[in-house]
């Protein structure tokens, strides 16, 4: 149980450190999604927190609030997909 156990413990510690570094890196990154040809723009960070939202006044129609709701949803989905794509690349490079 001597050197084999110590080696596995060291590998686990290295993987934990790599994971923490990846997590910290993601927190600093921003991913943007747009909808309606830029009428709505949402920026999220790697923790999926919304960093900013921009709305062009031309898409605000009090008679049809569902339009803006759909645009927000689409913009957020696009930003999340960009984040997920990068995250999957990062995960693929991890040794575990």
UniProtKB/Swiss-Prot annotation:
Keywords for this protein: Cytoplasm, DNA-binding
Listed InterPro entries: YbaB-like_sf, YbaB/EbfC
Molecular function in Gene Ontology: DNA binding
Compartmental location: Cytoplasm, Nucleoid
Domain of life: Bacteria
Main location: cytoplasm
Entry GO terms, CC: bacterial nucleoid; cytosol
Family in the record: Belongs to the YbaB/EbfC family.
Functional summary from the UniProt entry: Binds to DNA and alters its conformation. May be involved in regulation of gene expression, nucleoid organization and DNA protection.
UniProt xrefs under NCBIfam families: DNA_YbaB_EbfC
PANTHER family noted in UniProt: NUCLEOID-ASSOCIATED PROTEIN YBAB
Subunit composition and interactions: Homodimer.
Name of the protein in its database record: Nucleoid-associated protein CAB326
UniProt source species: Chlamydia abortus (strain DSM 27085 / S26/3) (Chlamydophila abortus)
Taxonomic path: Bacteria, Pseudomonadati, Chlamydiota, Chlamydiia, Chlamydiales
